[in-house]
A protein has these predicted regions:
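Conserved PLP-anchoring active-site segment centered on the Schiff-base-forming lysine
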Residues: 71-89, 118
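Catalytic PLP-binding core of fold-type I/II PLP enzymes
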Residues: 151-183
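Conserved N-terminal alpha-helix of the aminotransferase class I/II PLP-enzyme fold
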Residues: 13-61, 83-88, 94
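PLP-dependent aminotransferase-class I/II
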Residues: 99-144, 151-158
Length: 341
């Protein structure tokens, strides 16, 4: 059986594995204070054109979101998110477990707008009972969104302006950052993201690494005693070299972006194949996550031969399904899928 269930079905890119093997017996300090992590940090700083950035490595996306949000908010604050945001619907209440409310606002195709954030803030400010409420202390977005859609450069710039107006840090979840940046429809570079976001992370788990996410604080704004805060969450990896080595390789010779581009090419071919066979798109996603509307009967038939995600109900006879490509998707498996549909 072939699978397009998600974008973390395989292990790691062969070059990442080779770098891990080649450095395996080299002694290195722990907790991220090793020579490999230091080199990876410098490569990322050069790539994002942000020499004053502070970069830290964690293992997974939910862990990263929880650590960043919990560390940057006061105890009485919550984080603003799209109602479809990962922290709101797919993290098992991890943010709430750390003591912070996820304040959801309406989204369109997975995105929140600057005007909606501004409206929420003005409504909050004018509420005479606001001292009895959770204060908004941060804005969380993801790139791409949960529906594979992208913020434009102008949309991100407007969000940045509104966040500055209300002194809200802008935090971008970049679990699939490479897939967003390498999309044909992206008008941004990673340098733009570093410019407009106060903190973001570069996803490795879904893009070529065994595991790992690189947190980037762009405005000399790393929380105080951040190492200790990471430790509080049980997220401080003793063998920090493991994430450092992987990102060192991913940011050598544009590997991260090249393998991200492959996923987009596979997704575009998939989309064209579905459309040519008469299937409808739920959203016209420009990234590696593709959403289609399939009949219940077709879903039952396909589930016998291919794995994919049933996303949500469309109507009584149809469901929205997601097929995801990745850096490791092969032409062979994609062709098999297109034959099956």
């Amino acid at each position: 059986m072939i699978s397009f269930e998600n974008d973390y079905l395989e292990g790691a890119h062969e070059k990442v594995l080779k770098r891990l093997v080649d450095t395996n017996l080299v002694q290195a300090s722990g907790y991220g204070f090793d020579q490999f992590t230091a080199q990876a940090i410098e490569k990322i700083k050069d790539t994002i054109d942000c020499p004053n950035a502070t970069i830290r490595f964690l293992v997974g996306g939910t862990q990263t979101n929880q650590v960043v949000i919990n560390s940057m908010l006061e105890s009485y604050e919550g984080v603003i998110s799209a109602d479809t945001g990962h922290v709101a619907v797919h993290e098992g209440g991890a943010i709430e477990y750390s003591g912070h409310k996820v304040i959801t606002i309406p989204s369109k195709e997975g995105k929140v707008s600057a005007s909606d954030v501004e409206t929420y803030m003005e409504t909050f400010k004018s509420d005479f009972k606001k001292d009895h409420m959770v204060f908004p202390g941060m804005v969380y977005i993801s790139y791409p969104t949960e529906y594979g859609t992208l913020y434009s450069k102008s949309e991100l710039e407007e969000l940045c302006k509104v966040c500055k107006q209300y002194q809200l840090p802008l935090f971008m979840d970049g679990a699939r950052l490479g897939y967003g940046l390498m999309s044909d429809q992206s008008d941004m570079t990673i340098k733009d993201i570093a410019k407009y976001c106060d903190v973001f992370y570069i996803g490795g788990t879904k893009i070529g690494a065994l595991c790992g996410e690189a947190i980037v604080f762009t405005k000399n704004n790393e929380p105080k005693q951040f190492t200790t805060r990471i430790k509080h969450h049980g997220a401080l990896l003793a063998k920090g070299r493991l994430t450092g080595i992987q990102f060192l390789e991913l940011f050598t010779d544009n590997l991260y972006f090249n393998i991200s581009r492959h996923a987009i090419e596979m997704a575009n071919k998939m989309k064209d194949g579905f459309i040519n066979k008469g299937y409808r798109l739920y959203f016209d996603s420009p990234t590696n996550q593709q959403f289609f509307i399939l009949s219940n009967e077709k879903i039952a038939e396909l589930e016998q031969k291919v794995k994919f995600a049933v996303w949500e109900k469309y109507d009584d006879q149809h469901r929205v399904v997601r097929f995801a490509t990745s850096w490791a998707t092969t032409e062979e498996n994609l062709n098999k899928l297109l034959e099956l549909i």
